[in-house]
Amino acid sequence: MPEGPEIRRAADNLEAAIKGKPLTDVWFAFPQLKPYQSQLIGQHVTHVETRGKALLTHFSNDLTLYSHNQLYGVWRVVDTGEEPQTTRVLRVKLQTADKTILLYSASDIEMLTPEQLTTHPFLQRVGPDVLDPNLTPEVVKERLLSPRFRNRQFAGLLLDQAFLAGLGNYLRVEILWQVGLTGNHKAKDLNAAQLDALAHALLEIPRFSYATRGQVDENKHHGALFRFKVFHRDGEPCERCGSIIEKTTLSSRPFYWCPGCQH
């Protein structure tokens, strides 16, 4: 499943394609959304927001399209008139004079009023977004030590969108490798230095991934600015200590870690 950085980059691409441009055609696959098609013609997208792994497309008439890609949903940007060759099922089409955005395969799609936006079950449940520039390590530390989360093992906590929105499996393993911890630790057991390092890594690594993953620095031997240290690298030597990276399962998800420097 795409994680927060990937969802945010998708939102950036959608905004760049159609933000501020009048919609010339709107189509929804689901019957309950059909009445909104005519309401959106002539309106425009004001901005595209992310809340963790959910994407909110805001329109100039104050309606908001909520979508959660889950495992299979994917957005595409195409030139208007282009019909991509795909076996995926089209769910949403928002067309402007020159660009069209298409949502395929997603099933969790709703149209929300401003009032519904404040009471939506998923949006109420998610914690602060790791890509929100206003979220600080101090606030993250407070959440780590709160009665709700301090007794939770990191293996499960770092996948829980109620703790911090936008984290997922690759971020979970990369963050824990960065701070040298295994997934069975709890916040209540950390010393001050470990807690501080974790609070910073929980923000820095997702933000670095969002900003640089896929970009290349020709002065770096390995190329990409953001690259995995342990994720999908089982059987390879750890770049920090040389031990062999291992793979196991924690909280029903693949977990990659270094037994030499994660304790």
Curated annotation (Swiss-Prot):
Family annotation (CDD domains): EcNei-like_N
Organism name: Escherichia coli (strain K12)
Record protein name field: Endonuclease 8
Bound cofactor: record note: Binds 1 zinc ion per subunit.
Keyword Zinc-finger (UniProt): yes
UniProt keyword annotations, A-Z: DNA damage, DNA repair, DNA-binding, Glycosidase, Hydrolase, Lyase, Metal-binding, Multifunctional enzyme, Zinc, Zinc-finger
Effect of residue 3 to D: Much reduced glycosylase activity. No effect on AP lyase activity
InterPro entries, per database record: DNA_glyclase/AP_lyase_DNA-bd, DNA_glyclase_Znf_dom_DNA_BS, EcNei-like_N, Endonuclease-VIII, FPG_cat, MutM-like_N-ter, Ribosomal_uS13-like_H2TH, Znf_DNA_glyclase/AP_lyase
SUPFAM superfamilies: Glucocorticoid receptor-like (DNA-binding domain), N-terminal domain of MutM-like DNA repair proteins, S13-like H2TH domain
Chain residues that bind DNA: 70, 125, 169
EC number: 3.2.2.-, 4.2.99.18
Family indicated by similarity: Belongs to the FPG family.
